[in-house]
Each structure stands twice: as structure tokens, then as C-alpha cells.
């Protein structure tokens, strides 16, 4: 197999970001290595390509989007139909010092105000929302 100069640059970039991801994996999530299949999901995400990943319950799906969310710039929207799962994920991330929040129907006015303040200030890395939230035009314009 022949690599031209551009392929070498791309390969070096891939290795660099995988090294950075390993550091984040250890420091933020306390894992020494990725599980089987996770790197194959994360690589295209880091390159801006869409991915469909199907893993069993407990197979490490969340880490496949959480790790790139920390490595890449901006806000990552996580669409989840289950409020209980959103709460668990956000609590776990905030315990790790990761700026995450959820936006769901159980929130009171004060919680919504604080969330939108954080969102507008760019303080959030991950925002968990229900699928129907995407139907709200004001929300889509805001994010």
C-alpha cells in the first residue's frame, strides 16, 4: 500500500487525536482503554461523519459520543426519549466535572432560566433533550 504525503498527514492527525482521546478517557472517565468497537465508532465521528452504532445494553454507547463531545469544539446535543436516562447521564457527567445539562418537561422556570443562561454563555458541552424538543423552532434557533 502506497501512502502519499496527504495520507501521512491524515494518519498522523488520527494518531494525535486518538492519543488525546486516551488522555480524556483516563482523566475524565477513569478507563484505561476503549471497549471493542468503540474506536470504530469514534473515529468517523471525530472526522465529522455520521455513525449508527448498535451495542447491547451496557456496551459503552454513551462513551462513543461523550468522548468526542469533550474533544471537539462546541455543544453536543444528545437526543434521548427517556427522562430518567437523561438525568442519570447528566448527573454522572457533572460528577466528573463535565458541563452537561438536560432540558425536559420536568424542569421548573428557575431551572429553565439557569439552563438557558448557561447555554447562551457557551458554558455547556453536552445538552440532553427529548426528541420532540427538536420540533420547537425557538429551541432550534437558540442552539
Q: Whereabouts are the PLM-identified features?
A:
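Conserved catalytic network of the ASCE P-loop NTPase/AAA+ motor domain
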Residues: 69-71, 93-95, 117-122
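Residue-level recognition of beta-strand->loop/alpha-helix junctions
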Residues: 102-104
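Conserved helix/coil segment N-terminal to the catalytic DExD/H
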Residues: 59, 107-143
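Loop/turn-to-beta-strand initiation segments
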Residues: 50, 74-77, 123-127
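Conserved pre-motif I regulatory segment
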Residues: 14-56
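Conserved Walker A/P-loop ATP-binding site and its immediately adjacent core
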Residues: 75-96, 107, 111, 130-133
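Walker A/P-loop
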Residues: 48-67, 78-79
Amino acid at each position: 500500500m502506497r501512502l502519499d504525503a496527504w495520507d501521512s498527514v491524515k494518519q498522523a492527525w488520527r494518531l494525535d487525536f486518538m492519543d488525546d482521546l486516551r488522555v480524556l478517557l483516563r482523566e475524565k472517565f477513569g478507563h484505561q482503554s476503549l471497549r471493542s468497537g468503540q474506536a470504530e465508532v469514534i473515529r468517523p465521528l471525530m472526522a465529522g461523519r455520521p455513525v449508527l452504532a448498535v451495542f447491547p445494553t451496557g456496551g459503552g454507547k454513551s462513551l462513543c459520543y461523550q468522548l468526542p463531545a469533550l474533544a471537539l469544539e462546541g455543544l453536543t446535543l444528545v437526543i434521548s426519549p427517556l427522562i430518567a436516562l437523561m438525568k442519570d447521564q447528566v448527573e454522572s457527567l457533572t460528577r466528573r466535572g463535565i458541563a452537561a445539562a438536560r432540558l425536559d418537561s420536568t424542569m421548573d422556570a428557575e431551572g429553565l432560566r439557569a439552563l438557558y443562561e448557561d447555554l447562551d454563555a457557551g458554558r455547556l458541552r453536552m445538552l440532553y433533550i427529548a426528541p420532540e424538543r427538536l420540533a420547537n423552532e425557538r429551541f432550534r434557533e437558540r442552539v
